[in-house]
């Protein structure tokens, strides 16, 4: 591995960040370095205590407040360093939504009911806060690098008046329409969970011939075979609209299934050494029912491939209670093998590692501000910091703690985001920073004596499906 090449790329990437920050570029570079090198900060203001942060703590909030980035700012910065897929014949985009709980921010605007997992069984997994949609690039495994990496490209807050899946749809459309990025010209696969299998989302992306959508579907869905008219009905002239759907294909009813058009068997070994047999079945050219409201969605024009995946243990028993159902929709879906489809959907879970790392190590949801714009800017900064850690993945050295030295992952020396963050302070000391040293200008006069700021107004909590709103 040529360490000089990776070091040069990291320097160029940091210089590009510095040159494209419109306001307070020196402060933002120092803040990003502090975020990437301090894994145990408890609050955002603690980043001012890092050795690489040369300024006072108040400049952190001024820089966050004045941050202005374009919609495709981060994709343009990482575009020259995107690793072209070699094992896969496609680019992989992962879309998902995560929550930012803010139940006690009574003056924060546009809060709604969002999902939050609960440890205690029986409690409603609901809290008050915001939702953010993230689109990341799925990456192929690299030697010496952990497979949990993704490359975040876009982050956008989901307003209470918007559909979270359609926000992700809009983000992917920007990536597909940008000519400076390779996604619109090459075969691109997007993956999502069951909420992304709705007709509105699938229909919106059919205008891109190079885009293939892989989405999980619930086990109670119902699809249809294409309608094939008989000879008698062909001779008989009928009035009205021609029939579009054939026999029913009900996922919970195996009696409605036909023989699959394609099958494939894989063997997998877990981390604990258990061997599993994966059976993949596919039915081609199925149809789903469309919608008439709020707009007409003629889904009968877009056939798809239905995939059923079942995993068996060494004794032949099903490893999971329910099978995994996937739909594959797009003009170029036939270029994907069943193994490609299976591997692409497995990579969807890598974005969960990014959310977990961001919340635990980068304070993704810990910036307590009453301003929506500042919260959105902070989310953008966390995505940029994670991208900088990804750029340093080949430069960092694995630094396990004393009780971690004998772990299998440490013996393999696979650089994960956590290990790169531990070593990032050393990297910065060796490479230096493009930021200029601060120029103290003395103490500010501050507010005049006797000045009192008005109280912030309390905001309503948006509860969908009800006429009245709830007071926080």
Identify the meaning behind each predicted range.
Residues 1-66, 72:
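Gly/serine-rich nucleotide phosphate-binding loop at the start of the catalytic core
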Residues 34, 50, 80-81, 174-179:
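A generic secondary-structure signal
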Residues 51, 64, 96-99, 139, ...:
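Short, flexible loop/turn elements at secondary-structure junctions
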Residues 1-17, 21-24, 40, 106, ...:
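Single, function-defining residue in the core of a domain
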Residues 30-34, 136, 382-386:
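Contiguous, well-ordered alpha-helical segments that form the cores/surfaces of helical PPI scaffolds
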Residues 59-62, 73-84, 166-174, 187:
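Hydrophobic, well-ordered secondary-structure segments
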